[in-house]
Amino acid sequence: MPEPEGCRMSTFKIEKTGFLDRLFPERHWDELIGEKYKEVLQKISETTQLKDEVAGYIKNNRIRLGFHKQYKSGGGWTLLRNITLSPGDNPLSPYVLSLIVHETFHLKQTLWMRLSMQGELRAWQYQKYTYPEIARTKGNDIGSNGEAYAGTKEFWDELSKLSPDSRDDLEQAQGLMRKVSPGYRSGCLPLFPPGKEFVYFWRQREYAKAFGVLWKLITCK
């Protein structure tokens, strides 16, 4: 039985609102402000490398932090160049601090690089490389017992050895990321930035795959 016209309009409005919230979560997020925001930057600033590369970048570029429901991830970057975190998470925990480090690394990339496995692998590798500085027990690796992503250290170690410039390695990285975080949508991303992947398949006359790069990026869930 068809829905009344009013119901269809109501559903459309809900879907439109949901779509806009995914694009611009700042519309309805719980922003981290005041002393809590300063505490996060101070915590990240306790090491020289992260003070300059992350905390300084966040401060200088006026990057905002806010809590918003995530979809199969712990955090994310926004089109307005801000960072979202999962509601209820402690922003001062090593886990969340490492997410902020990860997403800040993304914000330094071009938009198209962020939308690729190449950009994703580089961010994961940076997250692993810098984690010991913010670990619960300083010096511990990410994924080790008692730390963020406990029990997944072997997968992080494998990810750290992969080349972001190798197509084979990027395909391997997709599987490893899902082992670290089941449900993670690494398979939605093209291996290289969308434009580069489109040209790659086009030149091989694999036209369906060329257009599929863009279609998958838009529709993948």
Segments predicted by a language model, with ranges:
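Post-HEXXH active-site segment of zinc metalloproteases
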Residues: 94-95, 110-133
